[in-house]
Amino acid sequence: FSPGYSVGYLAQEPHLDNDKTVKEVVMEGVQNVVDTLAEYEEINNKFGLPEYYEDPEKMDALLARQAELQDIIDSMDAWNLDSKLERAMDALRCPPEDQLVKNLSGGERRRVALCRLLLQKPDILLLDEPTNHLDAESIDWLEQHLQQYEGTVICITHDRYFLDHVAGWILELDRGEGIPWK
């Protein structure tokens, strides 16, 4: 892949930090958004400090940074992070957000990893059997999500019904040879 593109990979057996909660793992996918919101909040808290409101230069710098962050937050649609997180976790039937990863089954771990990856929004998604461990409603949500996905999605799957709903075109790999398939 060309430099500058982000790639996200869903493995069949994802490696997750066993000491974290479900929500902490999912939030890893949007850490840049969380950090930006935290910096914005930190700047807003500084407006009430005398060292800033009594110094016009510091206040101007603070206002300029706040405006930059506001633009970044708006472009990432970060104000809706909590609702996006809740919607994705619910649609993929993730376990309760406070549950420790070490107590999850293989299927639950995979749903958590998929949720984290989809919220991360990499330029290129590599999905290895993405419908494994998903119920029909979760598969339907995933199909709709991938149909609207702004990046490139590459799926390795045996689920032809799923492929029919999400694939723009299919490349069948057989003994090292790629064959376009319609």
Where are these regions (language model features)?
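ABC ATP-binding cassette signature C-motif
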Residues: F1-K182
